[in-house]
């Protein structure tokens, strides 16, 4: 009996060209996917130059003004202004009440800390 190489005893193929019998069944169990002959759609197409994608039409200042002036009635403008002022007032009140709550909380904490220090000194 010929001496086997250490790698062959463990079932490891020592030569890249030799195929061990137990590896043949793996090829049947897990076949390699067949590659398509064509390239996929995304890679086969020629791309447009990106520079043209970012170009825009020139716009004059007069055109912008016309767009802003169209369709805005004075009544809608007044409603928007009133709504904006109302939301500002609501925001002001909420921040004011929050600051009052903070002041009350900090004064309450200060009072409690002073009370506890007084009781400690009384002992």
Swiss-Prot record:
Kindly list the positions at which Phosphothreonine occurs in this protein. 56
Q: What is this protein called?
A: Uncharacterized protein C11orf96 homolog
| Keyword Nucleotidyltransferase found | no
Instruction: Give the sites modified to Phosphoserine.
Output: 73, 87, 97, 113, 119
Where expressed (tissues)? Highly expressed in the kidney (at protein level).
Q: Which residues form a coiled coil?
A: none
Question: Taxonomic lineage per UniProt?
Answer: Eukaryota, Metazoa, Chordata, Craniata, Vertebrata
Q: Which controlled-vocabulary keywords does the entry list?
A: Cytoplasm, Phosphoprotein
Tell me where it resides.
Answer: Cytoplasm
Question: Is Phosphoprotein tagged as a keyword?
Answer: yes
């Amino acid at each position: 009996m010929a001496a086997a190489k250490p790698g062959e005893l463990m079932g490891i193929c020592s030569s890249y060209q030799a195929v061990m019998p137990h590896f043949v069944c793996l090829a049947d169990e897990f076949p390699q996917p067949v590659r398509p002959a064509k390239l996929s759609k995304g890679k086969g197409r020629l791309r447009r130059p990106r520079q043209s994608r970012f170009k825009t039409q020139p716009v004059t200042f007069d055109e912008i003004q016309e767009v802003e002036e169209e369709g805005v009635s004075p009544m809608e403008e007044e409603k928007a202004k009133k709504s904006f002022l109302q939301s500002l007032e609501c925001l002001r009140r909420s921040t004011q009440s929050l600051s009052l709550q903070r002041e009350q909380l900090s004064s309450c904490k200060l009072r409690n800390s002073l009370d506890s220090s007084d009781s400690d000194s009384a002992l």
